[in-house]
Amino acid sequence: MALTKAELAEALFEQLGMSKRDAKDTVEVFFEEIRKALESGEQVKLSGFGNFDLRDKNERPGRNPKTGEDIPITARRVVTFRPGQKLKARVENIKVEK
């Protein structure tokens, strides 16, 4: 199961006593600020959590798995996430259920 924006808003509502509307708006503003920073080429650093970076990938050869045809994969910019030390430490010893 994945954590959703709606669940984040619900946590703000329950733990901080915000109205549901304000909690939803807060979550939206938070993610919009991250999007804006990345769109303008900035790194996003969230202390104790991790960093979002932009990385330029060069064009490279690829292959269509159905046809076997060689197809170039175009150059593009991607968002990467590097977890911080505190986040790594917290998830390091969690048992994974299958």
UniProtKB/Swiss-Prot annotation:
SUPFAM superfamilies: IHF-like DNA-binding proteins
Chain residue ranges for the region called Disordered: 51-71
Keyword Transcription among UniProt keywords: yes
Keyword entries, A-Z: DNA recombination, DNA-binding, Transcription, Transcription regulation, Translation regulation
Comp. bias regions, Basic and acidic residues: 53-69
Organism: Vibrio cholerae serotype O1 (strain ATCC 39315 / El Tor Inaba N16961)
Assembly and interaction partners: Heterodimer of an alpha and a beta chain.
Origin superkingdom: Bacteria
Matching CDD domains: IHF_A
PROSITE patterns to which the protein is assigned, alphabetical: HISTONE_LIKE
NCBIfam families for the chain: himA, PRK00285.1
Single annotated GO MF: DNA binding
Gene Ontology CC entries for this record: cytosol
HAMAP family, alphabetized: IHF_alpha (MF_00380)
Protein name in the entry: Integration host factor subunit alpha
One Gene Ontology biological process: DNA recombination
Coiled coil start-end: none
Keyword GTP-binding: no
Protein function: This protein is one of the two subunits of integration host factor, a specific DNA-binding protein that functions in genetic recombination as well as in transcriptional and translational control.
Family to which the UniProt record says this protein belongs: Belongs to the bacterial histone-like protein family.
